[in-house]
């Protein structure tokens, strides 16, 4: 694994991780409050089957935190500029939550550069059925992010907080978050994301993305956790109908499959792309 920085033509510094391998390129896009290296275990299980990139998206990790609307459209334009900067013409995209929204927009707007789109954990229903109730849920999630703890006296304190916040994650995955998504701040530790920017991005979970799905021509895989708390099988099949060529593939787990079940996610990606 190589760790690098690149300055995009819009001035954004993007920090990213690269696992050299065979073509095609596979781009991993993390969720809100996530970080590029959270795909590390999945990338290692994939081996050299793909040339893999995992990005710290704007507002996250060691990438820049400029002003902006932090919409999927803005992130998708960052992705376009990133691919150009690193010399990738076409790629398979795999994203979870925020990363999935970015992929949905990118695949529709840049079909000539998208070989396939994998939605890890599945898309948010609120992006396809933005009912009043769904919007209330989105705004509540955004508010919870604003109120979340972001500074800790020690790594042990951060780990204890994450255990309560993410009870489904493996202990190894929680420790990975502590090791790679915190930075020293004074005498303690702080998360490596801007929670105000993240909260703004979360508010876009009420944006209607159906128009993008309807324009997409590449194959789409909804990689749903088989005991998902976010998306039932029936809901996944219903949302899949908005794409011309989408399939639903169940993977052992709940939602953050790259943290809960990296080998299972890697196997599903391999089967889908064969």
Can you name each region flagged by the protein language model?
Residues 149-207:
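Conserved alpha/beta-hydrolase catalytic His-Asp/Glu region
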Residues 184-241:
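Conserved serine/cysteine hydrolase catalytic core
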Residues 89-132:
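Conserved hydrolase catalytic core segment
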């Amino acid at each position: 694994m190589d760790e690098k920085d690149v300055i995009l033509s819009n001035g954004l510094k993007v920090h990213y991780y690269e696992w050299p391998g065979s073509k095609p390129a596979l781009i991993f896009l993390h969720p809100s409050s996530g970080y590029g290296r959270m795909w590390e275990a999945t990338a290692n299980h994939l081996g050299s089957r793909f040339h893999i990139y995992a990005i710290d998206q704007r507002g996250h990790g060691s990438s820049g935190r400029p002003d902006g609307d932090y919409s999927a459209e803005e992130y998708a334009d960052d992705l376009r500029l990133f691919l150009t900067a690193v010399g990738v013409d076409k790629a398979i995209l795999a994203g979870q939550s925020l990363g999935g929204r970015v992929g949905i927009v990118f695949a529709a707007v840049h079909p000539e550069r998208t070989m396939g789109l994998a939605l890890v954990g599945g898309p948010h229903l609120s992006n396809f059925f933005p009912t009043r109730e769904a919007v209330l849920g989105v705004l509540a999630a955004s508010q919870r992010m604003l109120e979340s703890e972001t500074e800790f006296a020690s790594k042990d304190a951060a780990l204890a907080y994450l255990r309560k916040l993410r009870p489904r994650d493996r202990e190894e995955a929680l420790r990975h978050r502590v090791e790679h998504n915190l930075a020293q701040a004074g005498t303690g530790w702080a998360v490596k994301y801007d929670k105000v920017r993240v909260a703004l991005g979360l508010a876009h979970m009420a944006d209607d993305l159906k128009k993008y799905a309807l324009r997409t021509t590449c194959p789409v895989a909804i990689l749903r956790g088989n005991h998902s708390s976010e998306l039932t099988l029936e809901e996944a099949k219903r949302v899949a109908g908005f794409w011309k060529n989408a399939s639903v593939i169940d993977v052992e787990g709940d939602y953050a499959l790259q943290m809960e079940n990296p080998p299972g996610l890697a196997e599903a990606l391999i089967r889908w792309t064969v």
